[in-house]
Curated annotation (Swiss-Prot):
The lineage of its organism: Eukaryota, Viridiplantae, Streptophyta, Embryophyta, Tracheophyta. Oligomer (believed to be a pentamer but probably hexamer). Its main location: secreted. Keywords: Apoplast, Disulfide bond, Glycoprotein, Manganese, Metal-binding, Secreted, Signal. GO terms for molecular function: manganese ion binding. Belongs to the germin family. It is found in: Secreted, Extracellular space, Apoplast. It comes from Arabidopsis thaliana. This is Germin-like protein subfamily 1 member 19. It comes from the Eukaryota. Residues 76-213 form the Cupin type-1 domain. Disulfide bonds join 31-48. InterPro entries: Cupin_1, Germin, Germin_Mn-BS, RmlC-like_jellyroll, RmlC_Cupin_sf. GO terms for cellular component: apoplast. Pfam families: Cupin_1.
Length: 221
């Protein structure tokens, strides 16, 4: 059976149209629909300035040359430059962070629900990695990084960085969202508000319920 070229072109055009007809990714945790716009915000949480009123300061930020304070429980600090610091990033789908690590400090297991991350190590030695999804048997992809090395953390994957050196470490990372979001696994599981029922977590993690209660007390907001 011969198929006309015009039919093929029509079919391909329809497929291309369908491929482009997807919902944009949300830039906050949720967006509850309302009928009264007076009590609402735009889906990305930002209104746009009149382009004629834009100025250079809307696309500028400073301070990433300064080390973050790492005197905390995980001994690291993340300095974020996203749409909240640079309004001109709105709708551009990109942001940046500086991460400082004390010796043996870590950026604990976490995920960015809205962004892929690409990290470059500037100073020190890091052990980094991410874990793939259940469908991929939760494989660990990990490397030791030295200055100048680059590693990518795919969107949504749980990942971490640990300073395995005796000196401070510094890294910079780009994120494919103006507001990538961050979910720190231990904090949300054991420090949610209100707390998750400890019996649920005890069964999920195969722990004694008293151990879970102790963890929830430590991570309580």
């Amino acid at each position: 059976m011969k198929v006309s070229m015009s039919l093929i072109l029509i079919t391909l055009s329809a497929l291309v149209t369908i491929a482009k007809a997807y919902d944009p990714s949300p830039l906050q945790d949720f967006c509850v629909a309302i009928d009264d716009p007076k009590n609402g915000v735009f889906v990305n949480g930002k209104f746009c300035k009149d382009p004629k009123q834009a100025k250079a300061e809307d696309f500028f930020s400073s301070g990433l040359n300064q080390a973050g304070i790492t005197n905390n429980k995980v001994q690291s600090n993340v300095t974020t430059v996203n749409v909240d610091q640079i309004p001109g990033l709105n709708t551009l789908g990109i942001s940046l962070v500086r991460i400082d690590y004390a010796p043996y400090g870590q950026n604990p297991p976490h995920t960015h629900p809205r962004a892929t991350e690409i990290l470059v190590l500037v100073e020190g030695t890091l052990y980094v990695g991410f874990v793939s999804s259940n469908q991929d048997n939760n494989r660990l992809f990990a490397k030791v990084l030295n200055p100048g090395d680059v590693f990518v953390f795919p969107i949504g994957m749980i990942h971490f960085q640990v300073n395995i050196g005796k000196t401070p470490a510094v890294a910079f990372a780009g994120l494919s969202s103006q507001n990538a979001g961050v979910i720190t696994i231990a904090d949300i599981v054991f420090g949610s508000t209100p707390p998750i029922n400890p019996d649920i977590l005890a069964q999920a993690f195969q722990l004694d319920v008293n151990v879970v209660k102790d963890l929830e007390a430590k991570f309580k907001n």
